[in-house]
Amino acid sequence: MKKTIVFFITLLFCQFANAQNLVWRKMRVAHTLVENYETDKNNKKVRLGECFIVNSSNRELARGKYKNGLKDSIWNYFSANGDLVQVYDFTNKKLLYNIPDEGTIVKQRSEVDTAGLVKPKVVAPVKIGGLNYGFYLLYNERNLPQAAKDQKEDILMEYVFDVSATGKMEGFSINYISTFYNVEFKQSIKDLHQDAYEFIPATVNGKPVKSKLVYQVMLYISQARDRGTYNIPTHKY
């Protein structure tokens, strides 16, 4: 009995000591996203413990835990309206819950090669974190091409990701599509926030395969109050 009591006292002391060594830090991870996370007092680079990410409206889009700098256990992802849209288990690398985000401006399409197959069973690739969070990790309206902002009609903007059969991002481009303006800009995949790289691969008949996952967002150029500036609406009014 005494040994049991001593064990629990020691365990509680260790947990208290660990908590005392943790501090909260804050870092901007994208133009409109801020990450709040716990680290060791003496090593701010390694995340330990709780973490959550908020948008410019201070709405929480992601929440989970880190262990030794890696995502651990269950992470929850939310829409901009606060609805739970995805749950992912990083310990077991398993998608537990995933529903369409009805409130996001981001639409999705995917491309999977099924040439030569008869009635294949195709499961589209999935962005871990959801489309809305994944898009805003990379989007900054200040980086829109001047030629796009100078157009007189609305433009479809596509973020096209090449996803490997293991779920790795192998390529990334931004395409602008309209009647008179059609351009593809290849993007570097180096030094992005780590969440931007996280995908679940597509499958064909149960086998993981390469694919393309595409975010689609309309740029309502015709509604811009200051034509030619970076202030281009992504919502139709």
Residue ranges and their predicted role:
Residues 1-25, 237:
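Bacterial Sec-dependent N-terminal signal peptides
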Residues 24-237:
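Charge-biased low-complexity segments
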